[in-house]
Amino acid sequence: PIMNARVDFKVNQPKKILLTKKDYPKDLDFFNKDFLEVYKSKDLKKILNSLSLTDICSILVEAGPKLATSFLEARYVDEVIVYTSSKALGENGISWFHEDNAIENYGFKLESTYKISDDIKQIYKKDE
């Protein structure tokens, strides 16, 4: 993943932050431009406090099921955007949503749904 805005007009690209417990290949496109920092800590509160001391005022988290669940359980999320592909995950795919881990269990409600080509985009907001 490149994790940038791919549009045909000038735009401020997001700063990139990698949260990982593993070694990572530094030759990936992800690291080529506007790279900010790598955090190997598991302490989300410490990481977010560190980011709050910079010019970052909001973050977009693109994560797998474990990290996404960590953000939700710590109540660091106010909006969830889910893209559902029409393609199957395959044998080794990890599904995040199941009955015990439904997004509604974290206090979110579905606000809108959009069809984008063959995919579905759903936006959930914190139900306060």
Residue ranges and their predicted role:
Residues P1-E128:
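Enzymes that bind and transform nitrogen-containing heteroaromatic metabolites
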